[in-house]
């Protein structure tokens, strides 16, 4: 019994082990099915055929479990699916799930494309542009990747990283930095002049199981599922620092690295500073770059040095976390970690650690140098790849030109997208360009080889028709080119075989710079951007060339055989000579800049591609009729940015207007589409016309809403297309300022006007329309002309297709008819069309994804002559559509009401980060670094979860650990539950940030408020010395300091007394008076004190007394001088009078004679005599006396005067009269003055 127990236990253990193994095998077998799509084994294990099958299955099961674990963690950031509302139907729920899935796939594809190929985050406009293209089905995920891989920015990034490899001192190529070689076969029977373009190439990051197994095996052009290795960090990290050495004086010898002083100081500095870096992981070495003199003072030396770290050595602790987030598109806070993991994780504490270590070594006496820890600055951190060996590729076909694998990178990428089917039509672009974006550090051999490969033409024996797109750009980059508005491309004969294009970098410049023909000289032909998505022109679309003698100018790099074929077969199509002659003067000089934006090289396509399995449909060359007016207005900014965003779809057809229709078949189909419960009508039109179009057309129709028209050719079986989603936007979306869901119906009433005859151009362009692939075009609001054809008896909408390749303006003339009111139906023969204006409800919940809408922007010229003409421009500007509310009544739209963008404020608190005073300064490095970190964390998360997200702005950081105040702007209005949605998203972000990024965010500190309800001052870091002011127009809040306080470098407001210690001089006390500002309280002594605004004036008591006495004395002196001067003047007058009078002996007779003379009759003084009589009468009644003496008159006594008169011959009455006059003269001063006045007049 005792022996049986151990045996039983062993048997039971074997049984359990067997059952467990069986379950593992069955689980691996069940999970083996999805592993065919994507392999999770490493390339070494997947290609190792020596491993047993059972062991590989176990490894598959283990790796699958790990991947599923990561995918389950991924759900932390995104919710699983779309929430189902109780009011939704099954169809609506399914449609919402499909929309949600499509938006998620597009979002992740866009993020991965930007991160993989351009190594950066997409901008708002870029993200919106690619989301529209992806959601509308215009481009697929793989086509998007092909476009990004062939972009100029991607190639510049590759060249930049290749240039970094030449900076490393000594290292060898590794698998992580240099990719395996890929070989591409040359088609059988092809005579190629492409010098080694398809021999071999090396490209980082590309891997294939077939190439790893057998390097000599050819790889087909079919797209295969390849397991991509995770991107490894840079081989080396180089961090550049700058620090100041105190106690040293800079000399000119330190400029020369060969001087003894320079070498001595370098050795001393490295030996001392190296101690601070030895403890860091991955440290390799340090080198001094230069010594500089300090800018502020003369003492000290600024040392610029670089420290090298091993990127692989430090990945032990950080690479695991990076790999955890490698599959998470939304975690773009680690976007730079692929190249600089050390910088990202240690940049906030790196400077403090080094400065503290250096300072401690100096204090402990271990260092002879005295570095200033405050002057330590981290200038730059960059990753350096290991150098790779260049494999020289020799041409074995027809040339001895040797090139490197990096110079033919574009050709190898281009070859990947060529179809393996030999019957597929090949698209070829002859690119006569010469612009090369190679690295400045490239060698001369590489530059020579790249310039030699500018233009490569090869002949291929393919039976399928081909298409050649002519392109040209100016000779000098940034120069100006003559742009022909009406594109007139040359067409090759269908039998001319051409091969795929070969380009070394983005763009090229033709040495001649222009392509000339016999009719159009000194003009250039705007070419379509080179892309593998360009669709071919079939054989039957090429008109017969009877007299085609025009030759294409050859380039030095074209082969002679290709030049001869092009000379024979390229010419101007027949029937376009008149058009070319008419528009020869309509040229516009515009500047050209290199294509660096996303939209530059992208071209719409109709779903054709390598391995797509579709029949090859054809897009005909677009043509447009142009007027004779000369346009010299430069293109607008929005036009220059998006001119290459769409395929030119200019209508090459003859439109029938004024009812002159010979044979017209027009079918209008309106399909109703429902978004929720809101129907939106779309119009599709198929037309086949065989007439001409008058260029000038009269129209009195007001601007209408944008429509969509589908131009197709006349085919035997007319198919009706049913749309599930508009390619660009609904007809009109009206969103009122309120959030209530309303439906507005705009009825367009046609205005009846009589057709008037105007002079039309005699030149008509005959055009034949073969089979055409449907292409969607969007028209501006004013590009719609309503007509009614009498033969058909139904309304039709004739539209002119617009193209960004031309700026010609057409004047359309049409007779307007009044339509009778009938019940609105969706039948194609309705006479009154109703455009239903549906309110787009933009949900910002986690499960909703919105759509951005665009409309064409009309300039002032396009609205000109609205009374008799409607100007239509063939330029379509796709800009952001403003949110408008349209009136419900018919007629001309009176006005539009624009709704402002929604603003949401929120704040959160990070508890495991310490606040510093530098975070108050928005210009400090610490503030910018922290701001950039939060933007990289929050922007991708919010943009992927919120529809209509526009941008995020960090307003401020406040103390309290770290409180982040932010503001989010939305492009469109949002429902009232935006606060709740934002709160949920931020709450999930807090959880995710704590689990993945070691950020402890307090959930209870989350504060979310919408802009119309929130107080902007709440999210401003205004302290107690400032007040928050809100701009009533913009709603922006700003902190304004109180009087006496000042903000320096955007720091919180501080007192002037603290900011300016010398504000008060002479020991004055600075004080802040509320409402007045800073004042100085000056010192006061016993007999002295200071005064002035800053106490700058000294005053003492003796000095004041002296000044007072001096002032009094001065006043007295001045008064005395004035009195003395007046006395002198009076004395001088008396002296003059005395001199004028006679001597005393003759004084009496003169006095009497003067009185007598005064009494003589003078006719001029009769009035005075009458006055004298009145005096005599008054004085005759009163006795006369003299105040001096009664007996003395004029110095003589009364008796003496009487004796004098008696001795004369005067009568008694005369004597008596004269005596009275004398008495009056002596007693009355007024009379005396009167007498003296007349006496002076007589003299």
Curated annotation (Swiss-Prot):
Residues 1128-1136 are annotated as: Hyaluronan-binding motif involved in chondroitin sulfate A- and C-binding. One of its GO terms (biological process) is protein localization. It holds the Pfam family SEA. Residues 235-349, 900-1013 form the SEA domain. It is found in: Photoreceptor outer segment membrane; Photoreceptor inner segment membrane; Secreted, Extracellular space, Extracellular matrix, Interphotoreceptor matrix. InterPro entries: EGF-like_dom, IMPG, SEA_dom, SEA_dom_sf. Residues 207-220 have a biased composition (Low complexity). This is Interphotoreceptor matrix proteoglycan 2. The gene is Impg2.
């Amino acid at each position: 019994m005792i022996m049986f127990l151990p045996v039983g236990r062993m048997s039971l253990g074997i049984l359990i082990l067997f059952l467990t193994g069986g379950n593992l095998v069955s689980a691996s077998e069940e999970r083996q099915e999805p592993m065919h799509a994507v392999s999770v084994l490493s390339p070494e294990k997947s290609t190792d055929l020596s491993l047993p099958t059972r062991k590989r299955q176990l490894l598959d099961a283990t790796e699958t479990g790990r991947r599923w674990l990561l995918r389950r963690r991924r759900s932390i950031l995104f919710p699983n699916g779309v929430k189902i509302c109780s009011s939704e139907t099954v169809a609506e729920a399914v449609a919402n799930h499909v929309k949600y899935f499509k938006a998620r796939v597009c979002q992740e594809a866009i993020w991965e494309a930007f991160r993989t190929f351009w190594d950066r985050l997409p901008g708002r406009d870029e993200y919106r542009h690619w989301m529209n293209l992806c959601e509308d089905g215009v481009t697929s995920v793989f086509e998007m990747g092909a476009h990004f891989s062939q972009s100029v920015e991607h190639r510049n990034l590759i060249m930049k990283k290749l240039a970094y490899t030449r900076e490393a001192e000594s290292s060898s190529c590794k698998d992580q930095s240099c990719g395996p070689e890929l070989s591409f076969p040359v088609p059988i029977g092809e005579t190629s002049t492409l010098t080694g373009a398809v021999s071999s190439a090396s490209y980082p990051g590309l891997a294939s199981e077939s190439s790893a197994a057998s390097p000599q095996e050819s790889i087909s052009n079919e797209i295969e599922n390849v397991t991509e290795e995770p991107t490894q960090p840079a081989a080396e990290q180089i961090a550049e620092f700058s620090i100041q050495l105190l106690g040293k004086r800079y000399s000119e010898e330190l400029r020369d690295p060969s001087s003894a002083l320079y070498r001595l100081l370098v050795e001393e500095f490295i030996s001392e500073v190296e101690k601070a870096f030895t403890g860091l992981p991955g440290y390799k070495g340090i080198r001094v770059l230069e010594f500089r003199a300090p800018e502020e003072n003369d003492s000290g030396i600024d040392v610029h040095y670089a420290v090298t770290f091993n990127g692989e050595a430090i990945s032990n602790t950080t690479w695991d976390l990076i790999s955890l987030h490698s599959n998470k598109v939304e975690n773009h806070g680690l976007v730079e970690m692929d190249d600089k993991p050390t910088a990202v994780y240690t940049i906030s504490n790196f400077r403090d650690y080094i400065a503290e270590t250096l300072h401690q070594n100096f204090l402990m006496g271990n260092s002879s140098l005295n570095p200033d820890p405050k002057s330590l600055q981290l200038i730059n951190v960059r990753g350096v790849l290991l150098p790779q060996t260049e494999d020289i590729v020799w041409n074995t076909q027809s040339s001895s030109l040797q090139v490197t694998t990096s110079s033919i990178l574009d050709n190898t990428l281009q070859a990947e997208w060529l179809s393996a089917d030999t019957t597929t039509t090949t698209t070829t672009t002859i690119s006569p360009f010469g612009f090369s974006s190679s690295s400045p550090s490239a060698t001369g051999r590489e530059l020579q080889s790249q310039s030699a490969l500018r233009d490569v033409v090869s002949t291929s024996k393919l039976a399928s028709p081909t298409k050649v797109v002519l392109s040209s750009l100016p000779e000098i980059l940034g120069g100006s080119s003559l742009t022909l508005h009406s594109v007139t491309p040359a067409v090759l004969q269908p039998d001319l075989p051409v091969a795929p294009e070969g380009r070394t970098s983005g763009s090229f410049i033709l040495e001649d710079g222009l392509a000339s023909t016999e009719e159009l000289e000194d003009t250039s032909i705007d070419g379509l951007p080179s892309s593998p998505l360009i669709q071919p022109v079939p054989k039957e679309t090429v008109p017969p060339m009877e007299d085609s003698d025009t030759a294409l100018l050859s380039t030095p790099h074209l082969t002679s055989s290709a030049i001869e074929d092009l000379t024979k077969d390229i010419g101007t199509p027949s029937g376009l000579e008149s058009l070319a002659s008419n528009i020869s003067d309509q040229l516009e000089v515009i500047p050209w800049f290199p294509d660096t934006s996303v939209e530059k090289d992208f071209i719409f396509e109709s779903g054709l591609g390598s391995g797509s399995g579709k029949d090859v449909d054809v897009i005909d060359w677009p043509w447009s009729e142009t007027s004779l007016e000369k346009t010299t207005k430069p293109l607008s900014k929005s036009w220059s940015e998006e001119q290459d965003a769409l395929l030119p779809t200019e209508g090459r057809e003859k439109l029938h207007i004024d009812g002159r229709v010979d044979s017209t078949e027009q079918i209008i189909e309106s399909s109703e589409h429902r978004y929720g419960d809101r129907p939106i009508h779309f119009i599709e039109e198929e037309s086949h016309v065989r007439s001409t179009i008058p260029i000038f057309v009269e129209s009195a129709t007001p601007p209408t809403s944008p429509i969509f028209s589908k131009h197709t050719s006349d085919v035997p079986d007319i198919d009706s297309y049913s749309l599930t989603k508009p390619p660009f936007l609904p007809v009109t979306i009206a969103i009122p300022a309120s959030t209530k869901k309303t439906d507005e119906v705009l009825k367009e009433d046609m205005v009846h006007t009589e057709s008037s005859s105007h002079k039309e151009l005699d030149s008509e362009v005959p055009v034949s329309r073969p089979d055409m692939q449907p292409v969607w075009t969007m028209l501006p609001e004013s590009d719609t002309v309503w007509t009614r054809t009498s033969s058909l008896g139904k309304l039709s909408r004739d539209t002119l297709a617009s193209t960004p390749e031309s700026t010609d303006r057409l004047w359309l003339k049409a007779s307007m008819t009044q339509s009778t009111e009938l019940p609105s139906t969706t039948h194609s023969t309705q006479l009154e069309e109703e455009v239903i204006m549906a309110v787009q409800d933009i949900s910002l919940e986690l499960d909703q994804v919105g759509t951005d809408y665009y409309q064409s922007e009309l300039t002032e010229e396009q609205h000109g002559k609205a009374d008799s003409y409607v100007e239509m421009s063939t330029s379509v500007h796709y800009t952001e559509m403003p949110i408008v509310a349209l009136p419900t009544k018919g007629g001309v739209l009176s006005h539009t009401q624009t709704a402002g963008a929604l603003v949401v404020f929120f704040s959160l608190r990070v508890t495991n980060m310490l606040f510093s005073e530098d975070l108050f300064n928005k210009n400090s490095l610490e503030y910018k670094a922290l701001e950039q970190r939060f933007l990289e964390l929050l922007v991708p998360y919010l943009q992927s979860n919120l529809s209509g997200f526009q941008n995020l702005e960090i307003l401020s950081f406040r103390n309290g650990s770290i409180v982040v105040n932010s503001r989010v702007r939305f492009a469109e209005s949002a429902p009232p539950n935006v606060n709740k949605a934002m709160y949920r998203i931020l709450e999930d972000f807090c959880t995710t940030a704590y689990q993945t990024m070691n950020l402890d965010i307090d959930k209870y500190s989350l504060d979310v408020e919408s802009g119309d309800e929130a107080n902007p001052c709440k999210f401003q870091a205004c302290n107690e010395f400032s007040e928050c002011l809100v701009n009533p127009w913009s709603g922006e809040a700003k902190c304004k300091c109180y009087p006496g306080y000042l903000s320096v470098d955007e720091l919180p407001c501080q007192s002037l007394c603290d900011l300016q210690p010398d504000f008060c001089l002479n020991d004055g006390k600075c004080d802040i008076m509320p409402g007045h500002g800073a004042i100085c309280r000056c010192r006061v002594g016993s007999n002295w004190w200071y005064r002035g605004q800053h106490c700058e004036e000294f005053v003492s008591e003796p000095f004041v007394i002296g000044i007072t006495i001096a002032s009094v004395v001065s006043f007295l002196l001045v008064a005395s001088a004035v009195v003395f001067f007046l006395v002198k003047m009076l004395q001088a007058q008396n002296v003059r009078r005395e001199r004028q009078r006679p001597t005393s002996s003759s004084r009496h007779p003169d006095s009497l004679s003067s009185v007598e003379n005064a009494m003589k009759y003078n006719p001029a003084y009769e009035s005075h005599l009458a006055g004298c009589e009145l005096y005599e009468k008054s004085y005759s009644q009163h006795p006369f006396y003299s105040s001096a003496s009664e007996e003395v008159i004029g110095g003589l006594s009364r008796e003496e005067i009487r004796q004098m008169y008696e001795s004369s011959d005067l009568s008694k009455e005369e004597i008596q009269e004269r005596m009275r006059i004398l008495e009056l003269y002596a007693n009355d001063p007024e009379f005396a003055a009167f007498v003296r006045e007349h006496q002076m007049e007589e003299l």
